[in-house]
Curated annotation (Swiss-Prot):
It comes from Bacillus cereus (strain AH820). Gene3D superfamilies: Ribulose bisphosphate carboxylase, large subunit, C-terminal domain, RuBisCO large subunit, N-terminal domain. The active site is at 99 (proton acceptor). This is 2,3-diketo-5-methylthiopentyl-1-phosphate enolase. PANTHER family: RIBULOSE BISPHOSPHATE CARBOXYLASE, RIBULOSE BISPHOSPHATE CARBOXYLASE LARGE CHAIN. The keyword Cytoplasm does not apply.
């Protein structure tokens, strides 16, 4: 294979999956085939999309009801020659799913890149091992928390929040994705002030915390804004990838003057991936493509919290982020939304140690504040790695958290 193989879930009311697959393969490449003169067929053969696989799925009444017609469901695989497109994500996505995305009854499940094609993508600059080296934390999941309620607040408020989270043992604190450039907490000032706080905490408590700052602005200003952030001392860049595009992420990741990890936020991605019938699958969008384009971290809804993905989907995202690939470093999985300490055993059981446990309200909502919330999570992580049930741990911060949010994982064993 020298090009790319696209896997689709299709719904066909003509009940002829093979014909539908061939129509897609031709429609996204040379347009027609059977009526072409033999000589022209020979000339265009190397550009033709090829149907590799057609598999009929069981009938699904809910799908028929939603579409208001009876359809035949199937999985098809089509190979697109590398000759047809330039080796960049805009060209790849337009080739494999451009006008087809308007069908409304086709979902792009996966893209399998040839080795030749993979060479054109950077992958994570740091990856899991690089991030762990920055923090000197190698034996446990990382803990991340989020600034909350920063809109309309000043630098003093940010510094207080940051200090409390760092003292609580949080490894990474990230901006809220809706915190943009503003007069009260401008980008450079956030970074400089934040670094002062984190250095003070490190000198006092010996705990290192990294700050992920939200890089925003117009598309053609992003590189300059990212470089300003780096010059000010940014540890990590948070980036709302899907508000801009995967190719923009790649351009940031490939820039040698932006030598810091990039954290990809899933904001807007639901517009592409939420439907089970059409769009782009979450594992492909939030897993494989983010990793290839250069994300060191990928945030996505966990199977447990307030904005939940199905467990199978969440684990598939993580698989794409962390599976062995000689071309790319591994990216950190960051299952998010509604996470509290009682979920820690689930997260470690399902995602392993190479995961970032990300909490907002589960840290800030603790009775002892963000310090208590962070300590509760760290205690839960340590107990889980020792295979000790959380309810048996004698720790006031963890006990308080379990009283508030519950302990759904009390029977979980690693």
């Amino acid at each position: 294979m020298s090009g790319i193989i696209a896997t689709y879930l299709i719904h066909d009311d003509s009940h002829n999956l093979e014909k539908k697959a061939e129509q897609i393969a031709l429609g996204l490449t040379i347009g027609s085939w059977t009526h072409l003169p033999h000589l022209l067929q020979e000339q265009l053969k190397q550009h033709k999309g090829n149907v590799l696989h057609v598999e009929e799925l069981a009938e699904h009444e809910h799908t028929n009801s939603y579409l208001r017609k009876k359809v035949k469901r199937g999985i098809i695989k089509i190979e697109y020659p590398l000759l047809n497109f330039s080796p960049d994500l805009p060209a790849i996505l337009t080739t494999t799913f451009g006008k087809l995305s308007l069908d409304g009854e086709v979902k792009l499940i996966d893209l399998t890149f040839s080795d030749e094609l993979k060479k054109h993508f950077p992958g994570p600059k740091f990856g899991i091992d690089g991030i762990r080296n920055l923090l000197q934390v190698h034996d446990r999941p990382l803990l991340m928390s989020i600034f909350k309620g920063m809109i309309g607040r000043n630098i003093g408020y940010l510094k207080t929040q940051l200090r409390d989270q760092a003292i609580g043992g949080v490894d990474i604190v990230k901006d809220d994705e809706i915190l943009f450039e503003n007069a009260l907490t401008p980008l450079t000032k956030r970074i400089v002030s934040g670094k002062e706080v984190l250095q003070s905490v490190y000198e006092t408590y010996g705990h290192k915390t990294l700050y992920a700052v939200n890089v925003t602005g117009r598309t053609f200003d992003l590189k300059e804004n990212a470089k300003r952030a780096v010059q000010a001392g940014a540890d990590i860049l948070l980036f709302n990838v899907f508000a801009y595009g995967l190719d923009v992420l790649q351009s940031l990741a490939e820039d040698d003057e932006i030598p810091v990890p990039i954290m990809a936020h899933p904001a807007v991605s639901g517009a592409y991936s939420a439907s089970k019938l059409y769009g782009i699958s979450s594992p492909l969008l939030l897993g494989k493509l983010l990793r290839y384009a250069g994300a060191d971290f990928s945030l996505f809804p966990s199977p447990y919290g307030s904005v939940a993905l199905e467990k199978e989907e969440a684990l598939a995202i993580s698989k794409y982020l962390t599976e062995d690939d000689v071309f790319f470093k591994k990216s950190f999985s960051v299952p998010s939304a509604g996470i509290h300490p009682g979920f820690v055993p689930f997260i470690i059981r399902d995602f392993g140690k190479d995961v970032v446990i990300n909490a907002g309200g589960g840290i800030h909502g603790h009775p002892n504040g963000a310090q208590g919330g962070g300590k509760a999570f760290r205690t839960a992580i340590d107990a889980t790695l020792q295979n000790k049930p959380l309810h048996e741990v004698d720790d006031i911060n963890l006990h308080s958290a379990l009283q508030i949010w519950g302990n759904p994982s009390h029977e979980v064993k690693l």
